[in-house]
Each structure stands twice: as C-alpha cells, then as structure tokens.
Amino acid sequence: MRPLNSTLQFIAIFKLYAVRIFSFVTLFLLLNTIHAQGQIDTANVQAPISKFEIGVAGGLTVNKFSSGQPQTGTNTGYDAGLLLTYNVYKQWSIQLEASFTQQGGQLLTFKDDTRYGLPESFTTKNVKNSSVHLNSLNIPLLLRYTIPIKKDWKPALYIGGSYAYNFNVIERYQKTGNLLPGEDIITTVTDSENVTSRYNRDRLNLIVGADLRLPLFSNVKLLLDFRYMAGATPAYENYSYMEKIGFGSEIKSNSFIAKLGLIIPVQ
C-alpha cells in the first residue's frame, strides 16, 4: 500500500503545483495583455492640440508698384512682427498679425517744365530714378487650412487681407539733367526725400500664401512663411511718370514676402 500512497501523494502534489503554475502563467499573460493594450491606447491618443499659438517672424520683401504706369521697377525691404494663431476646428485656424512692413517700388519720372514756357535748367528738365519705401504698420488677418500630411510636418495654405498705415515714406533718387543748358554738361545728383504727404496714409491689401511649421526643440516650432500681398487700394493717386497734370493714374504696391520665425503653443 505504501507505493500506492506515494503515487497518490505525488499525483496530488503535481496537481497542486500544476494548478499554481497554470494560475501564475494565466495571470502573467493577462497582465501582459493589459499592459500591451495600454501602450497601444497611449500611442493612439494624440496630445491635445493647443488652441492658441504665438510667434515672432521676420524676413525680406520684394516690392513693385502696379503696372498702371509703364515706368516702374522693384526694390527690397524688411518685414518683422508678431503673430497669434487660434485653432478653430480641426485643420482650420485664424491668424492675426502685427508687423512693421516695408513696401513700395521703383519709379522712373521724366520732368520737362519747358513745355510750360519755363527756361531749361537742371530743375525744370531732368530724369529721376526713385526707390520708394512705404514704411507701414501692417495688420494682416488670415484664414489658414493645415494640410494633414504628417504629425510633425504641418504645411498650411492661407488667404486674407491686411490694413496698412503708412507712417513714413522715403524716396531715394538719382536725378540726371543738363547742369548748364547749351554746354551739354550732364550731371547726376543722388539724394533722399521724405514724401509721406504725397502717398495715402491708409491702404488695404489682399494676401495669399503658404507656411510650414517644423519641430525645432521642446515645444518650439520653426516657421517658414511665403506670401504675396497685392494692393487693393492705391498707394499713390494721380501719379504721372511725365509729371503731366491730367494724365495720372492710381498705383498700388505689391509685395512678395519670405519670412522665418519661431512658434510657441499656449495652453
């Protein structure tokens, strides 16, 4: 009977340990499954998008007056300012900016007052090549659509408009004419002039553009911004490249602007 008792005892012990091992393995597998599911859920849950983003940006402007007058050309300027983006719904957002912006362009003017009976001189008959900078406070309001390509790679397209206040207009020019009529002594004078009173103080612009926001470090993003700003209202009224009364037209300032900036989310 002892061998039978030993066998039964061994079987009982084996069953006991088998049940314990099975229970342990089952518990381990269950906990491992729960842990893995938790990791998947965490990976699937994206960090909440900040409603507001603030930033600074600056860059260069390439400017040209509208072709209402044939004698126009381009010049360059600067743009620098602040921006605030409000994420409205999914990929849609509104952006408000305040910036110092240089617009303008080049103008070529032919002056000949001898047609009015004045004697010929350097003052009454000359050719002036001017580069005009409209130094303005610019307030753009933009509607943005972010293209959902990648989580950390966010290009966007936008349209909008801006109000610009010209607080200062500077004209730098080269004026060429006959210094001594009859002697053919041609000279060129270089100078600058404040011509704020000749230009409209208030202007409106239409804007279309695109930007790209890339992760830089921590929560800071790098901003690349490219836009075209077209004048909706004139910068100069009744401008004539011949300085002839009654033959003038309105000219507007159009600009291509490229900027770099930094964006920080605000919770």
Describe the residue ranges of each PLM region.
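Gram-negative (and chloroplast) outer-membrane scaffold detector with strong preference
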Residues: T42-F52, Y86-L180, L216-S218, K259-Q267
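Residues that define the transmembrane beta-barrel architecture of outer-membrane proteins
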Residues: S50-F52, T74-Y78, H133-L137, W153, ...
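Extracellular loop and loop/strand-boundary signature of outer-membrane beta-barrel proteins
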Residues: S66-P70, T124-S130, E193-R198, E243-E250
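Cleavable N-terminal export/targeting peptides
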Residues: M1-P48, P265-Q267
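Long, hydrophobic/aromatic N-terminal blocks
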Residues: T72-V88, W92, E97, T187-T190
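Flexible, solvent-exposed coil segments and beta strand-coil junctions
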Residues: G59-F65, R115-K125, G182-E193, Y236-M242
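Predominantly the C-terminal beta-signal and adjacent terminal strand-loop region
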Residues: R203, D211-Q267
